[in-house]
Amino acid sequence: MSTPSFSPRTATVERTTAETDVSVALTLDGDGSYDVDTGVGFFDHMLSLFAKHGALDLEVRCDGDLEVDDHHTVEDVAIGLGRALDDALGDKAHIARYGHAYVPMDDALARAVVDLSGRSYCHLEASFERNQVGGLSTELVEHVWRSVADHARCNLHLTVLRGHNAHHKIEALFKAAARALRTAVRRRADHAEVASTKGTLA
């Protein structure tokens, strides 16, 4: 049996509305490099460490209506990220499909489980002691991951198991999601062409 030749998995998504102008460029088989500017400092930090811990290359630009609030910017970037993940994965041949990770961050401990099934679902269990961290409304953390799951067409179960510092809890969550995804997207020649008895993960 011949060994499959793996081509680079990249995607660029651009999205323009009356509220935001977003560009997301993604390389799944990267080295964790990033260049992120959304105008929301803490969100930039989370996306940057998502790239680093996910071993993917990520460029994000967003010019949003931050004079209103951070909602439109954060939502539209998450939509772009989800679409880029879906586009880059292509037919999902030879991927592991599933991934999970636990990540501690001082007082916080988070768990992420992902299935690149082609079906959208997100369940997040977390509470935060502050309404905002570094310009990011904490109520949007769940919205970020729901938007990613919807547009990447994947199944995400995310849990903050313990902690009391909102910054640490959110950071542990993003790192856990990144590391779970890193496992799920990994390609190996000895993996089934498509990891499903249906023959497709579309």
From Swiss-Prot:
Organism this protein belongs to: Salinibacter ruber (strain DSM 13855 / M31)
EC number: 4.2.1.19
Gene3D superfamilies, per database record: Imidazole glycerol phosphate dehydratase, domain 1
Catalytic activity: D-erythro-1-(imidazol-4-yl)glycerol 3-phosphate = 3-(imidazol-4-yl)-2-oxopropyl phosphate + H2O
Family: Belongs to the imidazoleglycerol-phosphate dehydratase family.
GO terms of molecular function: imidazoleglycerol-phosphate dehydratase activity
Official protein name in the record: Imidazoleglycerol-phosphate dehydratase
Pathway: Amino-acid biosynthesis; L-histidine biosynthesis; L-histidine from 5-phospho-alpha-D-ribose 1-diphosphate: step 6/9
Subcellular location: Cytoplasm
Keyword terms: Amino-acid biosynthesis, Cytoplasm, Histidine biosynthesis, Lyase
Keyword RNA-binding: no
Keyword Chloroplast: no
GO biological process, one term: L-histidine biosynthetic process
GO cellular component labels: cytoplasm
Main location: cytoplasm
Highest taxon of the lineage: Bacteria
Source taxonomy: Bacteria, Pseudomonadati, Rhodothermota, Rhodothermia, Rhodothermales
